[in-house]
């Protein structure tokens, strides 16, 4: 009997990228394999089965790939949370802190409606800054974030605690300690 692969088995680890001492978790190998990709989408959704979800929001950039697949599976709309200046219509924006400085993400000001229930999807939860900004944007439009789903959690960087402190449940398929 052939053992079933886990999502973790499809993720490649690249040492010293983008800097010395970093172990980069590369999910592109997960996306390249149809079995791995399907497994990841199914597992991202599993804790939210039975929940009302009106839209799926993906965080730039790999969250677009995963979030789009999740939205398709649910037959729901997809919302892009993008870096500032990339969306063509009227937007709202939210700044968040980086290690050195600040970044800004935005969504269209009509991306969700008041009362909508939104699931946020991304590949990786590290410090939680981008997820926090995405949650704030969606809530500013009057919608509710019912959860955040990630392929990978890096718990040592504190992102889960930051998102959960906002009252938003976090689901991650796998976790990696350290950097």
Curated annotation (Swiss-Prot):
Self-association and partners: Homodimer.
Originating species: Jannaschia sp. (strain CCS1)
Biological processes annotated in GO: adenine salvage; AMP salvage; purine ribonucleoside salvage
Major place of residence: cytoplasm
Full protein name: Adenine phosphoribosyltransferase
Catalytic activity: AMP + diphosphate = 5-phospho-alpha-D-ribose 1-diphosphate + adenine
Compartments reported by the entry: Cytoplasm
GO terms, molecular function: adenine binding; adenine phosphoribosyltransferase activity; AMP binding
PANTHER family for the chain: ADENINE PHOSPHORIBOSYLTRANSFERASE (PTHR32315:SF3)
Enzyme class: transferase
Keywords of the record: Cytoplasm, Glycosyltransferase, Purine salvage, Transferase
CC terms in the record's Gene Ontology section: cytoplasm
Gene3D superfamilies, A to Z: 3.40.50.2020
The protein's Enzyme Commission number: 2.4.2.7
Matching InterPro entries: Ade_phspho_trans (IPR005764), PRibTrfase_dom (IPR000836), PRTase-like (IPR029057), UPRTase/APRTase (IPR050054)
Described purpose of this protein according to its UniProt entry: Catalyzes a salvage reaction resulting in the formation of AMP, that is energically less costly than de novo synthesis.
Pathway stated in the Swiss-Prot or TrEMBL entry: Purine metabolism; AMP biosynthesis via salvage pathway; AMP from adenine: step 1/1
